[in-house]
C-alpha cells in the first residue's frame, strides 16, 4: 500500500458472537462499498478466512467486474480448493483476476513458497515487472523446486488426499460434538451470505463452554498428549 500509494477502504465483516470469529463479507456490504467508491480499482477478498469461512466469491467477482474493477483473492488457506470435490469454489474458478495461493500451508511445499495465479484480465509482463521491483531477482531454487514437486504431487493425488482429509475432519467434528461441552463448527454456519460456504477440511473447536480458553487446550494437548495443533 505504501509503495503504490493505494488508499484502502475496509469492509468490516460481521462477527459470530458465540464463537468470537469474523465471518465473510456480505454481498450488500461489498455492493455498498463499490457504490461509495466508484474510482476504486480492485476488490480484495479472503478465500477462505483462517477459520474456513467463505464469502459469495462469484457474486463479489461479478460486482467488481460490473464496476470496472479487478477482483483479487487472498487464498493463503485455499490451496486445496483447486483439488477438492465438495469444497468451496476456488478463486480462479470463480473468475477472480489474481489469487495468491500459499502452497506451503496446505499444499506441501517448503515454508515461504507460494504461487501467484493470474487471470486473462491481468498482463503477466506487468506483474513480472512489479515483482522484480519489490523483491529479489535472485529467487530461491530450493523453494521453486519444492513448489514444482508439490504441484506434481497435487496434480496426481490432490483430489484423493483432500477428500480423505475432509472425511477425517468431518469424523472428528462428529466425535468431538458428541462429547458435549465442545463445539466443532462446520457447514451448519452457512447462511447463504456472510457464511456462503465452509471449508470442511478445517477443524476448529470452541472450548469456552467447558471453562478453558483455546491456549489452555493447546498446552494440554501438547504437553500431556503430544498432539501439536496449529493455533489456540
Across the structure, where does each feature detected by a protein language model lie?
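Conserved PLP-anchoring active-site segment centered on the Schiff-base-forming lysine
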Residues: 1-2
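A short helix->loop->beta-strand "cap" motif at the edges of active sites that frequently abuts
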Residues: 6, 66-69, 96
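Hydrophobic beta-strand scaffold residues
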Residues: 8, 71-72, 229
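Active-site phosphate-binding strand-loop segment of PLP-dependent enzymes
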Residues: 19-80
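Active-site PLP attachment segment
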Residues: 90-129, 135-146
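Structural signature of PLP-dependent enzymes
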Residues: 150-173
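Conserved C-terminal alpha-helix-loop-beta "cap" of PLP-dependent enzymes
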Residues: 170-232
Amino acid at each position: 500500500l505504501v509503495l503504490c500509494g493505494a488508499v484502502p477502504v475496509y469492509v468490516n465483516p460481521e462477527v459470530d458472537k458465540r464463537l468470537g470469529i469474523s465471518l465473510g463479507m456480505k454481498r450488500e456490504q461489498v455492493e455498498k462499498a463499490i457504490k461509495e467508491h466508484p474510482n476504486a480499482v480492485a476488490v480484495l477478498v479472503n478465500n477462505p478466512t483462517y477459520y474456513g469461512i467463505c464469502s459469495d466469491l462469484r457474486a463479489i467477482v461479478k460486482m467488481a467486474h460490473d464496476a470496472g474493477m479487478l477482483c483479487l483473492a487472498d487464498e493463503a488457506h485455499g490451496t486445496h480448493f483447486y483439488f477438492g470435490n465438495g469444497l468451496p469454489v476456488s478463486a480462479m474458478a470463480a473468475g477472480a483476476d489474481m489469487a495468491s495461493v500459499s502452497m506451503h500451508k496446505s499444499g506441501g511445499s517448503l515454508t515461504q513458497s507460494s504461487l501467484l495465479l493470474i487471470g486473462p484480465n491481468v498482463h503477466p509482463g506487468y506483474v513480472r515487472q512489479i515483482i522484480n521491483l519489490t523483491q529479489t531477482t535472485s529467487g530461491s531454487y530450493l523453494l521453486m523446486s519444492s513448489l514444482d514437486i508439490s504441484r506434481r504431487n497435487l496434480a496426481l493425488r490432490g483430489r484423493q488426499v483432500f477428500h480423505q482429509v475432509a472425511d477425517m475432519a468431518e469424523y472428528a467434528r462428529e466425535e468431538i460434538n458428541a462429547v458435549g461441552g465442545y463445539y466443532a463448527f462446520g457447514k451448519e454456519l452457512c447462511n447463504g451470505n456472510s457464511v456462503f460456504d465452509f471449508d470442511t477440511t478445517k477443524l476448529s473447536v470452541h472450548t469456552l463452554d467447558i471453562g478453558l480458553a483455546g491456549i489452555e487446550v493447546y498446552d494440554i494437548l501438547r504437553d500431556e498428549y503430544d498432539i501439536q495443533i496449529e493455533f489456540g
